[in-house]
Design a protein with these regions (language model features):
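N-terminal strand-loop element at the rim of the active site
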Residues: 5-11, 23-68
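Conserved donor-binding/catalytic core segment of Leloir-type glycosyltransferases
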Residues: 149, 195-220, 232
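Carbohydrate-associated surface elements
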Residues: 154, 175
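A short helix/loop element that forms part of the nucleotide-sugar donor recognition site in Leloir-type
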Residues: 181-195
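Nucleotide-activated donor-binding/catalytic signature segment of Leloir-type glycosyltransferases, i.e.
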Residues: 244-260
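Aromatic "clamp/platform" in nucleotide-sugar-dependent glycosyltransferases that forms part
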Residues: 261, 280
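Short hydrophobic beta-strand element within catalytic cores of glycosyltransferases
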Residues: 297-300, 310
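Conserved acidic donor-binding segment of nucleotide-sugar-dependent glycosyltransferases
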Residues: 312-313, 317-320
């Protein structure tokens, strides 16, 4: 098959899962075309089955905000015709499902029918999509998708509760390719991060308020008073600078390492003894799954789709 995948090309869970799905489909000898505004961060290898098509938005002074949706839908139309695309798979409802629908209708005018799968990931529903300015468009886009999937039962329930959805929603959980982490344990150089006596605690996120970054630091501060420990903070976002200041104010600056964004998540997790995920809201919690595959127990909040991933008393513990 010729498959077009539309996603955000960033370090967030939706972009990571979309990229990993495309890579897996390419290994099955499908032709996979990623269509977005820059090459996805996890897409570090293009080959005869994986293609990237950049969406460019020309600057025009009349527009206060450049119309990415129009550029994306036009790019989709061109790609479907040029590469004989069989199916569109759009990840994250805003604006991808809406742009996908526009592309479908333009193609129908030329007698071309292209099915569209929309995968809902979380904040596209619970935060951004639920805003009154976007809600009608999100509802319309979901209802006019051919197939709709959600990454968790919790997100499916939220979608049906918040929107007037007529389409059936199938739950397809996020996944990780276990084969890519199998050698990390023998290559792990834990001594670079901490002494033998110290425990290593890790947090990975986009450093937004919903991730409760300040609580991560408070939790670690309590732990390090009882147990010699280091905290690894992986990611970038609006609370990064504030988190660095708080670590300094708490007097734990020398015990906290800020990595920024990284494509070497597995190599960082192999150092870790514990993974913290105290999110206020989480539709799945891909970072927790990444920790588990690296044999790291997870302590997380008991919210959203996290209990579907982190099984209390099995893979870690849930906290109220």
């Amino acid at each position: 098959m010729n498959i077009a995948i539309v996603c955000y090309p960033t370090f967030g869970g939706s972009g990571v899962v979309a990229t990993e799905l495309g890579i897996a489909l390419a290994k099955l000898n499908h032709q996979v075309h990623f269509i977005t505004y820059k090459q996805p961060v996890r897409l570090d290898l293009l080959n005869q089955n994986i293609h990237f098509h950049e969406v460019t938005v020309p600057e025009y002074p009349l527009f206060h905000y450049q119309p990415y949706e129009l550029a994306l839908s036009s790019k989709l139309v061109d790609s479907v015709k040029k590469y004989d695309i069989d199916v569109l798979h759009v990840h994250y409802a805003i604006p991808h499902a809406y742009a996908g629908y526009m592309a479908k209708k333009m193609l129908e005018e030329e007698g071309i029918y292209i099915p569209m799968v929309t995968t809902l990931h979380g904040t596209d529903i619970t935060l951004v999509g639920n805003h009154p300015f976007y809600k009608p468009a999100v509802t319309f886009s979901i209802n006019n998708s051919d197939i709709v999937t959600s990454v968790s039962e919790s997100l499916k329930e939220d979608t049906l509760r918040l929107f007037d959805i007529k389409k059936e929603i199938e739950v397809v959980p996020n996944f990780i390719d276990v084969s890519v982490v199998k050698n990390n344990f023998t290559d792990c150089q834990r001594g670079l991060m901490a002494t033998e006596e110290e425990r290593i605690i890790t947090h990975i996120s986009n450093f937004r308020p919903v991730k409760r970054i300040m609580d991560v630091l408070d939790i670690f501060n309590t732990i390090q008073k009882e147990i010699p420990s280091k905290l690894l903070m992986v990611g970038e976002g609006p609370e990064r600078l504030e988190a660095e200041k708080k670590a300094k104010d708490l007097g734990i600056k020398n015990k906290v390492i800020f990595f920024g964004n990284s494509n070497e998540i597995d190599k960082i997790l192999c150092f870790s003894d514990l993974f913290l995920l105290p999110s206020e809201r989480e539709s799945f919690g891909l970072a927790a799954l990444e920790a588990m595959i690296n044999r790291v127990p997870v302590i997380s909040s008991n919210t959203g789709g996290i209990p579907e991933v982190n099984i209390n008393g099995v893979s870690g513990f849930l906290s109220e």
